[in-house]
């Protein structure tokens, strides 16, 4: 009953996992590369349920990345399980040294160099480094092509399970009646690396260094006939026993070898590079930036020479590590084994198999030990860790967006400051221009006012010049007018003030009338006589005015004569001097003539005083 219930529960889990995962393409093209002699097993397998196991399960907790732990021990039977090759058979080879012992004895750095990642790899849900999101300084990790396992014996690109896997299949068939241990969580196997079967995918790196995640090689179990279960231990044994050069020396590297990989340290940024020694690796190396403080928690990534994983089982780490998961030139990739795109976090969550059962085509039987028992709590913890990783990734994205927002704010503030300064300069320039224009307007206004005043003055002067003749005539008319007014005033005074009007005087009106009339007659007679004399006086006045003009002309002529007399005196003196000079010249000529006429008797010359 228990076996039947286990089968039913396992069938439900397989159906739920197959429904949850992405649909695969048919595996028909891979049939031509495999040998048909190997009989196919049924697609359903008896896999013990991890939830209904009567044995007490032990919760597997993720080890701390700081505390170094040894790999869990496993039974030697797990190292006999190897993939069976479709073309050739290999003899069952047992490792001379248990893999778990090798992992314990080897240094952490040598294990990392030989396997490409630590023995305990992160679960896909926790592969994403949580501390990388908060570090501004990143580390460039070019993945080396040295770590790619070489296949020199054949160019076939099919999966070749080893004979140890056949032996393991026979052993599993003989022991199918007994109840199997609760299988461990499925994880991405390490390609050709020493991995203990007891190591779960949820475990973290043992030391503080980074690790490399190698995608699984035998994800597509449909390409292998007769065996649908794979073990990680037998692949590790097979990779250890490969007769390739420089393979055994990888496991003997000390921890000092990795110090040569850290080449430059500049401002908190490390660049770790590995030398490429594979002669048939032609794919380009990809860079992975990570923080030095988050090396213990760095999510692994696959080497360029490793095989690609299936889309439903690939471990997606980040968009930057997708380039490092290329294909080896010597190992082609079938259309059904192509590399799926990387960069969607939903694929990371969907690739983790938490508490959803195990597909029959993906089951890997591990060693039957008590250390492989897992519980539901570990799956819940994995889910929580995956959510935490996504939350921290969202926080990292938010911080990046906030940094970009801060940069744009700074750029906008700087642009606003520049525009504000430019506006101030423009305003100041406009104010200066306005002030200069206002000054020019004031100057033009004052000049216009002055010009208007000058025009008014010129007009006033022209009017006054026209009135000057009338004003000059007015002076003469005013003088005559004043004289006539003075005569009229004298007559009125003589007629009024000389009469005895005060002291009670009395006069006879008849006699007064007669006296007044007689006085008037006398005055009229006097006026007629004065009028006759007045004409004579006017003539005399005219003669006197002519005489004044003549006298003035005479005075002018007298002044002129005086000047002429003064000049005549000077001219007279000059005339006398000239005459004297002429006389002297004449005398000199005469003496010279006399000397020429009588040369024997020279005459003495006497100078005139």
UniProtKB/Swiss-Prot annotation:
* Span list, region Disordered: 1-227, 271-369, 588-609
One Pfam family linked to the record: QWRF
Low complexity: which segments have biased composition?
A: 98-110, 129-143, 271-285, 302-332
Q: Where is the composition biased (Polar residues)?
A: 11-21, 46-57, 151-180
Q: Where is this motif: QWRF motif?
A: 407-410
Mind telling me which InterPro entries this protein's record contains?
Answer: QWRF
Q: Tell me its family.
A: Belongs to the QWRF family.
Q: What is this protein's name?
A: QWRF motif-containing protein 4
Which species does the entry assign this protein to?
Arabidopsis thaliana (Mouse-ear cress)
Gene name per UniProt: QWRF4
């Amino acid at each position: 009953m228990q076996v039947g219930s286990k089968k039913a529960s396992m069938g439900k889990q397989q159906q739920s996992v197959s429904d949850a995962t992405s649909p695969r393409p048919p595996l028909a093209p891979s049939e031509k590369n495999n040998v048909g002699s190997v009989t196919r097993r049924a697609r359903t397998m008896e896999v013990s349920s991890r939830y209904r196991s009567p044995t007490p399960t032990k919760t597997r907790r993720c080890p701390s990345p700081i505390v170094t732990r040894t790999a869990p021990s496993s039974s030697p039977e797990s190292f006999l399980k190897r993939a069976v090759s479709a073309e050739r058979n290999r003899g069952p080879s047992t490792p001379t040294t248990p893999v778990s012992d090798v992992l314990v004895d080897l240094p952490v750095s040598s294990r990392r160099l030989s396997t490409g990642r630590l023995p305990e790899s992160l679960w896909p849900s926790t592969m994403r480094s949580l501390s990388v999101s908060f570090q501004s300084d990143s580390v460039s990790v070019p993945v080396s092509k040295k770590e790619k396992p070489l296949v020199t014996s054949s160019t076939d690109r099919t999966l070749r399970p080893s004979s140890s896997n056949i032996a393991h299949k026979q052993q599993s068939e003989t022991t199918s009646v007994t109840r199997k241990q609760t299988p461990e969580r499925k994880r991405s196997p390490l390609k050709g690396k020493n991995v203990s079967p007891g190591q779960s995918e949820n475990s973290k790196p043992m030391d503080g260094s980074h690790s490399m995640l190698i995608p699984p090689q035998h994800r597509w179990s449909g390409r292998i006939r007769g065996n649908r279960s794979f073990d990680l231990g037998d692949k590790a044994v097979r990779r250890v026993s490969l007769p390739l050069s420089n393979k055994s020396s990888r496991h003997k590297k000390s921890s000092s070898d990795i110090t040569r990989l850290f080449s430059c340290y500049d401002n908190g940024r490390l660049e770790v590079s590995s030398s490429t020694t594979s002669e048939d690796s032609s794919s380009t190396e990809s860079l992975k930036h990570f923080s030095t403080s988050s090396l213990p928690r760095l999510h692994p990534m696959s080497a360029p020479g490793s095989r690609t994983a299936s889309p439903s089982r690939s471990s997606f780490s980040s968009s930057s590590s997708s380039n490092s998961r290329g294909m080896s030139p010597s190992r082609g990739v079938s259309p059904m084994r192509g590399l799926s795109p990387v960069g969607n976090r939903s694929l990371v969550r969907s690739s983790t198999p938490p508490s959803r059962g195990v597909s029959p085509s993906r089951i890997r039987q591990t060693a039957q030990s008590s250390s492989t028992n897992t519980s539901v709590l570990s799956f819940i913890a994995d889910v929580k860790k995956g959510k935490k990783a996504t939350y921290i990734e969202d926080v990292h994205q938010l911080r990046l967006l906030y940094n970009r927002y801060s940069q744009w704010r700074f750029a906008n503030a700087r642009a606003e400051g520049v525009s504000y300064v430019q506006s101030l300069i423009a305003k100041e320039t406009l104010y200066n221009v306005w002030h200069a224009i206002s000054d020019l307007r004031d100057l033009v206004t004052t000049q216009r006012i002055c010009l208007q005043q000058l025009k008014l003055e010129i007009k006033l002067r022209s009017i006054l010049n026209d009135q000057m003749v009338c004003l000059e005539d007015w002076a003469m008319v005013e003088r005559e007018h004043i004289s006539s007014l003075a005569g009229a005033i004298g007559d009125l005074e003589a007629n009024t003030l000389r009469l005895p009007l005060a002291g009670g005087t009395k006069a006879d009106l008849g006699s007064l009338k007669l006296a007044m009339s007689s006085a008037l007659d006398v005055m009229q007679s006097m006026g007629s006589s004065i009028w006759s004399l007045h004409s004579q006086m006017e003539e005399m006045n005219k003669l006197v005015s002519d005489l004044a003009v003549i006298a003035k002309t005479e005075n002018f002529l007298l002044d002129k004569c005086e000047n002429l007399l003064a000049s005549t005196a000077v001219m007279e003196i000059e005339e006398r001097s000239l005459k004297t000079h002429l006389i002297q010249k004449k005398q000199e000529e005469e003496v010279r003539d006399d000397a020429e006429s009588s040369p024997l008797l020279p005459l003495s010359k006497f100078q005139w005083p």
